Amino acid sequence: MSAAIRPLIAGNWKMNGLRASLSELKLMLEGAGKLSATADLLICPPATLVAAFAQKLAADTGSRSNSFAIGAQDCHPRASGAHTGDISAEMLADAGASAVIVGHSERRADHGESDALVREKAEAAWRAGLVAIICVGETQGQRDAGQTLDVVGTQLAGSLPDGATAANTVVAYEPVWAIGTGRTPTVADVEQVHGFIRKSLTQRMSGEGSKVRILYGGSVKPSNAQELMAVADVNGALVGGASLKAGDFLAIAAGCP
């Protein structure tokens, strides 16, 4: 991890959580103060909870609003219109979100999202004043075929819009085969891919590319967080299941050097 880049620990709750889950957010906020000097924290609940979570964050006098934020898991590329069931970035911002995940592997697989669509969604996030967390990563078959860097490079080139900065963009590497499986790449594998992403960003964005946060996502848990966070060019984590419990999420954040 680069000492010059403040780490971000982002929790993706996926399709989990009801209003009763505010109790977990309360515990996270209570523990966040101890970690405010260590990392920025972000929780991305389902869209149905974004407003409630943002209101809780705003009302909590013990929270550190500059280091704890609420995000969302997806957005439509258009600001409004006849798109039944979809949610725009503007709506998410209005609900209190400050960031949105785009291009998650589950969206790419379940909904057939292309790099071009992910790019549009990232641009929509910026339009609404949100940080775009752009996800890239290979499947097991692609990894076995030795295509990891080719796949990640192609996704990054196609999904990252022109105009990206360290302020409006985060990149998350999530090897698809590691998500929710309990399996993680070796430290050497993570370092290779994150180094490749960093090089790609600096080639495209010049000096700005050296400042963009690159998160690792894929079965991150308290037991492996410290080792992963110590890897060069790993600037935080995109956490799935382990972010549903305050204790686990805070323990992962505590693993940041």
UniProtKB/Swiss-Prot annotation:
InterPro entries: Aldolase_TIM (IPR013785), TIM_sf (IPR035990), TrioseP_Isoase_bac/euk (IPR022896), Triosephosphate_isomerase (IPR000652), Triosephosphate_isomerase_AS (IPR020861). The keyword Cytoplasm applies. Keywords: Cytoplasm, Gluconeogenesis, Glycolysis, Isomerase. The keyword Isomerase applies. Pathway: Carbohydrate biosynthesis; gluconeogenesis; Carbohydrate degradation; glycolysis; D-glyceraldehyde 3-phosphate from glycerone phosphate: step 1/1. Its main location: cytoplasm. PROSITE patterns: TIM_1 (PS00171), TIM_2 (PS51440). One of its GO terms (biological process) is glycerol catabolic process. It holds the Pfam family TIM. It is found in: Cytoplasm. GO terms for cellular component: cytosol. It catalyses: D-glyceraldehyde 3-phosphate = dihydroxyacetone phosphate. Substrate binds at residues 12-14, 180, 219, 240-241. Its EC number is 5.3.1.1. Involved in the gluconeogenesis. Catalyzes stereospecifically the conversion of dihydroxyacetone phosphate (DHAP) to D-glyceraldehyde-3-phosphate (G3P). Belongs to the triosephosphate isomerase family. Homodimer. This is Triosephosphate isomerase. It comes from Rhodopseudomonas palustris (strain BisB18). The lineage of its organism: Bacteria, Pseudomonadati, Pseudomonadota, Alphaproteobacteria, Hyphomicrobiales. The gene is tpiA.
